[in-house]
């Protein structure tokens, strides 16, 4: 029998400017945080936000699938479970998206690290993503979310395949700081101000590739080059370690009926801090 299933909420706010509490960061040698994006970038960001407004990300459990790993119709990666998680981080190179066109159906993939959401209804997370279709050109972006305190906040829309990304979530008491850094392309990095959540369970930590869902079900998963997660670190209570230092759940993404694999993580490396997530099919 498959084990616990993640529960994840991802919704958007229509906003033409960064949300309150967000500190945009210039990378070394780039424009300062006060830089205003060009009109074309602002328009693109609004177009992305319009698509994001109808996303929902509650996991859909698969019935009758027998696995040693966890089965999901929208998540692929690793989730640690336990209690008192206070930080996690990872690095990756932004995957390249293909079979994705402006005039085609809406497709999306997001890659993130986060606390909670696997066995709770709160989510504190940040990462990168790509969206296309329904009249919007293929666009890569950075984002963060606190749910239910905040919904998804799209930040930079200038991410490119091959960009070097690092992401972290750090909790101090009931305050969370989410940071995503694009060390390759300016205008995508950010650090949030401390975000409050007194009801967050801090019961899981995740490194996940995901396809969002709408009211009609999960979106098609665009083909992505292998997402390689490295330098994954996590802390819970006084214990610090890697993914394998805690109870780790390997999450494989299946289509809606559980008939075939859409994305699948590799085994962890010997250090327990790296894995590869491989695209298999769109739907």
Language-model segments: which ranges?
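Exposed, interaction-prone regions of secreted/extracellular proteins
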Residues: 2, 12, 32-283
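Secretory targeting and sorting signals
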Residues: 2-34
């Amino acid at each position: 029998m498959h084990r616990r299933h993640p529960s994840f909420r991802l919704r958007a706010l229509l906003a033409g400017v960064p949300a309150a509490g967000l500190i945009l960061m210039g990378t070394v040698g780039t424009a300062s945080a006060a830089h205003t994006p060009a009109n074309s970038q602002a328009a693109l960001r609004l177009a992305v936000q319009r698509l994001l407004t109808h996303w929902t990300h509650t996991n859909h459990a698969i019935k009758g699938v027998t696995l040693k790993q966890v089965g999901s119709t929208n998540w692929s990666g690793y989730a640690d479970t336990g209690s008192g998680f206070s930080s996690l981080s990872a690095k990756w190179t932004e995957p390249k998206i293909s079979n994705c066109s402006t005039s085609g159906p809406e497709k999306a993939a997001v890659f993130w690290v986060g606390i909670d959401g696997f066995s709770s209804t709160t989510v504190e997370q940040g990462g990168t993503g790509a969206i296309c279709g329904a009249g919007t050109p293929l666009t890569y972006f950075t984002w963060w979310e606190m749910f239910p305190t905040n919904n998804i906040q799209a930040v930079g829309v200038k991410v490119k395949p091959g960009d070097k990304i690092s992401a972290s979530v750090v909790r101090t008491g009931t305050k969370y700081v989410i940071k995503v850094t694009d060390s390759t392309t300016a205008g995508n990095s950010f650090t949030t101000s401390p975000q409050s959540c007194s009801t967050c369970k801090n019961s899981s930590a995740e490194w996940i590739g995901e396809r969002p869902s709408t009211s009609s079900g999960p979106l098609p998963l665009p083909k992505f080059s292998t997402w390689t997660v490295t330098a994954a670190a996590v802390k819970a209570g006084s214990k610090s370690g890697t993914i394998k230092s805690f109870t780790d759940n390997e999450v494989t993404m299946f289509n809606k009926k559980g008939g075939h694999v859409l994305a699948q993580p590799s085994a962890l490396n010997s250090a327990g801090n790296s894995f590869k997530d491989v695209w298999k099919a769109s739907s």
